[in-house]
Every structure is written in structure tokens, then in C-alpha cells.
Amino acid sequence: MATLAQQKIRIRLKAFDRRLLDTSCEKIVDTANRTDATAIGPIPLPTKRRIYCVLRSPHVDKDSREHFETRTHRRIIDIYQPSSKTIDALMKLDLPAGVEIEVKL
């Protein structure tokens, strides 16, 4: 079993708004650095584009269509040598509602 000094915490973040995602990444990295852990990142991952094609008219006109898209921005942050203070500070961190967070130990 690995000790706390050899462990790594990997945090994956997803959001539709890039600015909201970047501010959340800054908060996590600042919190990790304040508790004497080593934070590497945020590492940007490829942005996923999802395009939806919708008919403009509710009736016959099939030639008239409209396209909508959603972009999902993703980041990874690795935290090396976390202490119990680091984990407690990350648990108490208040992040915006539009950011999905996945934590792996």
C-alpha cells in the first residue's frame, strides 16, 4: 500500500464555460500550493464539440435548418505529495456550480 508521500491525486474538471473552468483550476492549484503539496497543471485536454441540427420550421420546409453547438472544455490537475491538510482544504473548497469535478486517488 502506498504511503501518503507517494500518492498522487488526479483531478479532472469539465465545463461549458472556459473562464469558469480556469478560475476553478486557479483555486485548486492555489489551495494545493498553500498546503505544501506540488500541483502540476492545469493541463488542457481537447475540447469536445457537440453539434445539433434542428429544423427551423415546424412544418414542411426541410431545407431550412439551424445548427447549435456545445463545447465541453476539460482540464487535468495532478497533485503530488498530498497531506491530510491538502485533502481537507480541497474538500472545503467552494467551486462554481457549472464545473464538473472528478477526483481519483
Curated annotation (Swiss-Prot):
Involved in the binding of tRNA to the ribosomes. SMART domains: Ribosomal_S10. Pfam families: Ribosomal_S10. One of its GO terms (biological process) is translation. One of its GO terms (molecular function) is structural constituent of ribosome. Coiled coil: none annotated. GO terms for cellular component: ribonucleoprotein complex; ribosome. The lineage of its organism: Bacteria, Bacillati, Cyanobacteriota, Cyanophyceae, Oscillatoriophycideae. Keywords: Ribonucleoprotein, Ribosomal protein. This is Small ribosomal subunit protein uS10. Part of the 30S ribosomal subunit. PANTHER family: 30S RIBOSOMAL PROTEIN S10 FAMILY MEMBER (PTHR11700). The gene is rpsJ. Belongs to the universal ribosomal protein uS10 family. It comes from Crocosphaera subtropica (strain ATCC 51142 / BH68).
